[in-house]
Regions:
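Aromatic/His-enriched, Gly/Pro-containing loop or helix-boundary segments
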Residues: 79-93, 100-113, 156
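Hydrophobic faces of well-ordered beta-strands that scaffold small-molecule active sites
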Residues: 7-11, 55-57, 100-106, 129-135
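N-terminal beta1-alpha1-beta2 module of alpha/beta enzyme domains
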Residues: 1-96
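Flexible, glycine-rich active-site loops centered on histidine and acidic residues
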Residues: 12-33, 108-174
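Secondary-structure transition/capping motifs at alpha-helix termini
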Residues: 1, 96-100, 124-131
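A broadly tuned preference for mixed-charge, low-complexity surface segments
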Residues: 53-67, 102-112, 156-157, 162
Length: 174
């Protein structure tokens, strides 16, 4: 099969822990996501055995406003929140696997290019080249507030910042 005919498969683990758990009373009791890394270790090993190419960890630094413009329902019912920073998990998973890649999300709006380059260079080394960056400009006002801003930066300004970010960050990531 040629490269042109190859399909690459990724598992999106962004919201794995809460998508529908809010519908099941008591579903948080004993849930493995918060107590240990074994849950993700098993997923990584299983995905690699299944010849998947990538585990994708989408992320945000704030809650969504998908339910009536408020984060109340999200927080009260645990819908896609809370979430852990998966950065520390990547080296653990990479040591347990040999082929599968990992994609980690980092915002160009709230992170500094030096920090981003430093993190991804380190992850590139410890994963032996199996790391990808899901660069986002962020979208939620609660994320802005969590980073110390009263309002979300305007859409155009976020994308101008992202362009500048890539210009200064990308050359250091090679």
């Amino acid at each position: 099969m040629s490269e042109k005919d190859t399909i690459h498969l990724a598992a999106d683990l962004s919201f794995l822990h809460t998508d529908f758990l809010w519908r099941m009373p008591g579903s948080w009791a004993g849930y493995p996501y918060y107590s240990s890394s074994e849950f993700y270790e098993e997923i990584a090993k299983t995905a690699e055995r299944g010849r998947m190419d990538l585990l994708f960890f989408g992320d945000t630094g704030g809650t969504s406003e998908d339910f009536g413009g408020s984060h109340d329902a999200v927080v009260t019912n645990g819908v896609k929140w809370p979430r852990h920073d998966m950065t520390p998990m990547i080296p653990i998973l990479a040591r347990m696997t040999k082929q599968i890649g990992y994609a980690l999300t980092m915002s160009t709006t709230y992170h500094h290019p030096f920090h981003c380059a430093r993190v991804f260079n380190a992850l590139d080394h410890v994963t032996k080249g199996r790391i990808a960056w899901n660069a986002v400009t962020s979208a939620y006002k609660w994320e802005a507030m969590n980073w110390g801003f009263d309002v979300m930066m305007e859409h155009g300004e976020r994308y101008r910042r992202a362009q500048e970010f890539f210009g200064s960050c990308w050359p250091t990531m090679g």
